[in-house]
């Protein structure tokens, strides 16, 4: 199932994404990546522990950078604003429309104004707390269970064992020093970027404390020295004699609860009101648009529901002097091999298969092994692994990503340059069969027959013209013409000059005075 799109986002929503939401997320993740990278570069064990965490953080860091660039490049704000201006003019034509839809855009404008005032607090809660230092999320998971430990000894022992299981999973890929630096850097970022009037009480206490005096690294050092929630051994020792008093006095717990209580007391209700008004404004606006543009098809966002998307495999040109083909091959994979970089490592077995060109039945007609292909399908987050079917209903690949230019696609889809990236089914089967040796899985599959490659539009036109040349019913007036020196001459659209010349001779005869036009040049039909 896909995640979510927001294709009918208003101009205020686009502006807020570009100017506030996206850059704030990027700023926080930028700092988080810097901290992780520094520790990962210093120790191999830490690099292995945090490789997937780093990748997850970088994924949406890059996504929001790309989305902002795409929205600006496509002038999405201006497009949305123009449609809203058109809508306003349409509404004001009649009192009935004003009564029905007149408040729609005002509701949206007011809701986004209110949202802007609380947005940073919400972003920092999500990005710097729940996805920041892992001590916060660990506290979130375990503190209620500690406060509600059963009195019965047997039940209490079972509850403590469950807490230990949570801790083992939590601390499996965890580094205390890295987490301490994350705590310091992200709390400092929170302190420096959210106005003091919108901050939890704990931040002012850290700024004014005689020991820390606003030094977040000093505060973090104290927290990670004294808290039982920053290492597995300390937590297990705490569970020997669990104490709600010690829990509530812990500085990491107090910081987390201060942030959460502030959000629930000061922000949560305002956020609910914003969401309610946004929903009302959007319902009115979309209903009005459908009435204003009765012939336009308005497809739903269909968030988190099963949906189908269709497209064509094809290349694209994202900018001047830039062009990307529609496939990548094993040759390209080997060109990028760098076994010092996790993202570009090629296992030895795969290298051996490449050197031997042992592709089996998975090579294409030219002997190449296709790895990925791109298409104009419209996908979003959550579509990784979605099957890609051809016109015959056969599985030809699985979608796993979008191109850089597609990062703005959740808000605005542009068919010319936004592409879905899919892994070719032949490469999947090659890995299962040749690389992994799991032939029993291949034996269970029904393999589709080889089919001829569909002709391109140019090739199809050439074939049609060739057929027409041999058709006695084909006459000159079926060809388009251009004016050349006052004379209408036929345009021959053929793949090659030879084919174009043969068709012209067949139609008009061989003559030095008979002209035809092919690819920007005028020729005679005279045979020499």
Regions found by a protein language model. Give the residues of each.
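Terminal presequence/propeptide segments associated with secretion/organelle targeting
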Residues: 1-473
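Terminal leader/tail segments of proteins
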Residues: 471-514, 518-528
């Amino acid at each position: 199932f896909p995640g979510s799109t927001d294709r009918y986002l208003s101009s205020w929503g686009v502006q807020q994404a570009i100017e506030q939401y996206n850059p704030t997320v990027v700023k926080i993740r930028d700092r988080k990546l810097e901290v992780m990278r520094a520790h990962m570069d210093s120790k191999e064990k830490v690099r292995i522990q945090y490789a997937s965490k780093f990748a997850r953080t970088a994924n949406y860091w890059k996504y929001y950078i790309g989305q902002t660039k795409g929205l600006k490049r496509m002038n999405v704000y201006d497009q949305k604003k123009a449609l809203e201006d058109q809508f306003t003019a349409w509404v004001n034509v009649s009192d009935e429309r004003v009564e029905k839809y007149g408040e729609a855009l005002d509701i949206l404008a007011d809701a986004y104004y209110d949202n802007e005032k609380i947005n940073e607090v919400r972003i920092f809660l999500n990005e710097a707390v729940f996805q920041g230092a892992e001590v916060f999320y660990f506290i979130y998971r375990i503190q209620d269970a500690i406060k509600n430990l059963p009195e019965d000894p047997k039940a209490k022992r079972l509850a403590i064992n469950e807490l230990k299981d949570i801790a083992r999973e939590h601390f499996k890929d965890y580094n205390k020093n890295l987490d301490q630096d994350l705590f310091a850097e992200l709390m400092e970022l929170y302190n420096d970027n959210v106005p003091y009037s919108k901050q939890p009480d704990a931040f002012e206490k850290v700024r004014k404390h005689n020991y820390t005096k606003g030094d977040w690294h000093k505060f973090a050092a104290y927290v990670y020295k004294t808290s039982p929630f920053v290492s597995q051994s300390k937590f297990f020792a705490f569970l020997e004699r669990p104490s709600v008093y010690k829990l509530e006095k812990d500085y990491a717990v107090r910081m987390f609860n201060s942030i959460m209580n502030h959000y629930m007391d000061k922000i949560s209700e305002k956020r609910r009101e914003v969401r309610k008004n946004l929903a009302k404004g959007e319902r009115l606006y979309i209903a009005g648009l459908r009435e204003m543009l009765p012939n336009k098809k308005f497809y739903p966002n269909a968030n988190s529901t099963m949906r189908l998307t269709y497209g064509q495999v094809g290349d694209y040109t994202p900018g001047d002097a830039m062009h990307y083909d529609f496939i990548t091959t094993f040759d390209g994979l080997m060109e990028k091999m760098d076994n010092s970089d996790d993202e570009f490592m090629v296992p030895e077995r795969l290298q051996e298969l490449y050197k031997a060109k042992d592709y089996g039945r998975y090579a294409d007609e030219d002997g190449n092994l296709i790895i990925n292909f791109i298409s104009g399908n419209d996908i979003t987050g959550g579509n990784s692994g979605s099957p890609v079917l051809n016109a015959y209903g056969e599985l030809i690949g699985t979608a796993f990503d979008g191109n850089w230019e597609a990062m703005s696609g959740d808000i605005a889809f542009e068919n010319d340059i936004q592409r879905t990236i899919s892994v070719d089914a032949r490469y999947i089967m090659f890995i299962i069969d040749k690389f992994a040796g799991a032939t029993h899985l291949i034996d269970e599959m029904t393999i589709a027959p080889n089919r001829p490659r569909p002709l391109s539009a140019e090739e199809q036109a050439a074939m049609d013209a060739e057929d027409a040349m041999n058709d006695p019913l084909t006459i000159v007036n079926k060809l388009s013409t251009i004016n050349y020196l006052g004379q209408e001459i036929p345009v021959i659209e053929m793949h090659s000059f030879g084919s174009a010349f043969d068709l012209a001779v067949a139609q008009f005869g061989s003559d030095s005075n008979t002209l035809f036009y092919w690819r920007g040049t005028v020729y005679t039909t005279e045979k020499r």
